């Protein structure tokens, strides 16, 4: 059974680059929930949405590798460019190394221009069951 599409975090094209980075793409259309109230006269993607997209890229790539990853914080985040409805974003995150905790750099770009960048703290939930496409194995 396919995983239903997430209307808040509609990531697509998840991949691992030849350099080992985790990437995904997203295009938030004008009807996206993220634009509700932000701002009616000139819709903009909120910064928190960009952080949520980086977080979700880590979580989904972790699941692909059978790891349950969470993001517990951000540091050094800089927002460099406004993002408008319909623009495609590329989210790129340093891959999670072996171990239970790491700081990973992330970049969000649009048309090759930096939108946001910084560092996120990722942790692996230890003692969890391996993850499959239908949930946790053994449950």
Q: Whereabouts are the PLM-identified features?
A:
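A generic structural signal for short beta-strands and their flanking turns/coil linkers
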Residues: 20-24, 35, 70-75, 87-89, ...
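Hydrophobic beta-strand-centered segment that forms part of the acyl-chain substrate-binding groove
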Residues: 55-92, 101-103
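Hydrophobic residues in beta-strands and at strand termini
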Residues: 26-28, 79, 122
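Catalytic strand-loop segment that frames the active site of acyl-thioester-processing enzymes
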Residues: 3-45
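Short amphipathic alpha-helical face segments that pack within enzyme cores
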Residues: 48-56
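HotDog/MaoC-like acyl-thioester-processing domains
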Residues: 9-11, 17-21, 85, 94-139
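Short, solvent-exposed secondary-structure boundary motifs
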Residues: 1-7, 82-87
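Residue-level signal for inorganic ion chemistry
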Residues: 47, 93
């Amino acid at each position: 059974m396919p995983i239903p599409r997430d209307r808040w975090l509609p990531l697509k094209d998840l991949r691992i680059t030849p350099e080992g980075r985790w990437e995904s793409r997203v295009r938030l259309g004008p009807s996206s929930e993220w634009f509700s109230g932000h701002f009616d006269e000139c819709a903009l993607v909120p910064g928190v949405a960009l952080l949520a997209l980086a977080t979700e890229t880590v979580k989904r790539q972790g699941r692909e590798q059978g790891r349950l990853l969470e993001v517990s914080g951000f540091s050094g985040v800089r927002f460099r460019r406004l993002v408008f409805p319909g623009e495609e974003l590329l989210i790129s995150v340093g891959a999670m190394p072996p171990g239970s905790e790491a700081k990973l750099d992330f970049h969000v770009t649009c048309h090759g221009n930096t939108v946001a960048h910084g560092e996120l703290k990722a942790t692996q939930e230890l003692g969890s069951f391996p993850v499959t496409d239908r949930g946790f194995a053994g449950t």
